[in-house]
Design a protein with these regions (language model features):
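Start-transfer (signal-anchor) and selected internal transmembrane alpha helices
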Residues: 1-45
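Membrane-interface transmembrane helices that cradle and orient dolichyl/undecaprenyl
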Residues: 177-182
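Active-site lumenal/periplasmic loops and adjacent helix-entry segments of GT-C-fold
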Residues: 37-175
């Protein structure tokens, strides 16, 4: 093999990227750190993968997913499980859980709800916060490193919707905010 060409050159470039703290591999490492921290935090308040929260509103949200599965309608305009006709209730979270259930073939609503919760906290929130910080700090390394840790240290965002009552729609909306602000 030729020196300095092919996979060896790419491998060295990737290693330099990781060590120097610049480039896509370094960003992937920061994201993985932040996602892991968020996952640990979320895992601390569920007893088992298919357990559901014993706080306010949980049964409503689990039943809303069941209602969508049973009726086939995920429209906020026609959701009348407990609301009066003509009332609008945000079903983005419930639709996401239902879609995940249908695509995965899983049958347990609590299990899929927890899986989506982990995905939103670990993937959506951390990706959005790190990307927004990169945009606001002109990709300065110190800003991205601090954000990777602090994204999981802020107790109110987005986790307040999970710890106080179960406010899944607010949790999803809060997790989406950094990406929307880009």
């Amino acid at each position: 093999p030729a020196r300095g060409g092919g996979w060896s050159a790419r491998g060295r470039a990737a290693a330099r990227s990781l060590v120097s703290g610049h480039g896509p591999l370094a960003d992937l490492g920061l994201w993985a750190l932040s996602a892991a921290l968020m996952t640990v935090i979320c895992a601390r308040f569920i007893n088992a993968p298919d357990a559901f929260s014993q706080t306010y509103d949980t049964i409503f949200h689990l039943n809303a997913v069941r209602w969508i599965l049973d009726t086939g309608s995920a429209s906020s305009l026609s959701f009348d499980m407990v609301t009066a006709r003509g009332a609008i209730y945000p079903l983005g979270w419930h639709t996401l859980v239902t879609l995940t259930m249908r695509l995965s073939g899983a049958a347990s609503i609590p299990l899929v709800t927890n899986a989506v919760m982990f995905a939103v906290a670990g993937l959506v929130w951390t990706s959005g916060v790190i990307a927004l910080t990169g945009a606001l700090t002109a990709d300065r390394r110190a800003g991205r490193v601090a954000t990777a840790v602090l994204a999981s240290a802020a107790p109110a965002f987005p986790l307040l919707g999970l710890f106080w009552g179960i406010l899944y729609p607010m949790f999803l909306a809060t997790a989406l905010l950094p990406g929307i602000l880009l």
